[in-house]
Amino acid sequence: MQKTWSDRFEEGLNPFIESFNASINFDFLLIEEDLDGSIAHARMLAKTGIITSEEADQLEAALQKIRLEASQGLFKPDISDEDVHMSVERRLISILGPLGKKLHTARSRNDQVGTDLRLWLRRRIDDIDIELKKLQVALFKKAEKNLLTLIPGYTHLQRAQPLSLAHHLLAYIEMLQRDRNRLADVRERVNICPLGAAALAGTSLPIDRAFTANQLGFTSIYSNSLDAVSDRDFTVEFTAAASLIMTHISRLADEIILWASEEFSFVRLTDRCSTGSSLMPQKKNPDVPELVRGKTGRVFGHLQSLLTMMKGLPLAYNKDFQEDKEAVFDTVKTVRDSLKAMTILLEEGLEFSLERLKETVEADFSNATDVADYLVSKNIPFREAYQIVGRVVRLCIQKKILLKDLTLKEWQEINTLIDHDIYEKITPEKVVAARISDGGTGFDRVREELEKWRNDLISLNQ
């Protein structure tokens, strides 16, 4: 196929350079958005009198025909098309003849591709938000069933204080909500229309940019044509938000991997979401969370590549921008697939080992802080109480017993203010229930949080 720009040149492209230069192998993914943008552009050209209404109707009918052909696999790109825009134009001209050549009036591929990518990403952000909500619901259902289930809480991966398992799971719901809020914020800046900026300076024709933007569901237009065709901030913002999503679910994935190990044994992996070893017949491997954890670095890499691509570009459009799409496309797929995999894992891939959890929270010194709090209630300054309990823990370790195993006499030898009620205060259930501050793991506080999230997420289940 002859290039649209070939009249300027005396020689054809080197075949390898033609392939190297082309983006059609990956940007054909934008076919729907390219057709949407072209239909809106044709309507605008008719509204402003640049083409007739009859011509616009014919263009729209032909573009819809191309959409149908693409959906049926009948319209396929060719390497000579260079990109999705030229592929559509080639087919349009083959259908309409000279009329097809009018569509690109007052438009450049520079503003066209920016429009296509924004339309595509806007839809994908909405898709990812749905997957985030589904994962929140899966976490909520696990949390709702485990309000009274206790799990060790850790700092530095050392046992710290016991928690309600529901409280632990709700922490991830909070993270995912921040992710959703960030995506909504990014979407606002994705939803600005560059169409009409043309190559870089605008056009001398009497176009109506606001009309086109409205047709495509954009909330506003770019105020500066140079910025319109050269802005890829939205790809960086999206990939940064996606990186945080992956960070959060990678943390959850890593915990599940630990919990599923024999050393922890907090969860049992089901056959539905596990694989085995080709050599060791006893193995059941947590491949799903491991893959999610591994794919996180892939998204981080895309963020870095986009930042590096943009950092040295003069205004306005540069061919470097062709490299933005694969990074964005793969980020979307990776995030969406990872969220879906984690949701399935929570729904049917793991079961909490309640007996093991109970055994674990009863077999450590994570109730030591509550002994200090008990002494504070007896008017002993906290730092002094802290030091007393440190000595008590050391004594227990030497005797190979737990705090609950100390006799009342031994307690009172430590401090005469300690009474028999100390035993009730340091049971794991009482330790958790005592955390009554807002946002704490106390059962009443967690019950309130569950109710809040039930109201927030209920619409998804309808």
From Swiss-Prot:
EC category: lyase
Pathway: Amino-acid biosynthesis; L-arginine biosynthesis; L-arginine from L-ornithine and carbamoyl phosphate: step 3/3
InterPro entries membership: Arg_succ_lyase_C (IPR029419), Argininosuccinate_lyase (IPR009049), Fumarase/histidase_N (IPR024083), Fumarate_lyase_CS (IPR020557), Fumarate_lyase_fam (IPR000362), Fumarate_lyase_N (IPR022761), L-Aspartase-like (IPR008948)
Keywords linked to the UniProt accession: Amino-acid biosynthesis, Arginine biosynthesis, Cytoplasm, Lyase
Subcellular location as annotated: Cytoplasm
Family: Belongs to the lyase 1 family. Argininosuccinate lyase subfamily.
Protein name: Argininosuccinate lyase
Source organism: Prochlorococcus marinus (strain SARG / CCMP1375 / SS120)
Originating gene: argH
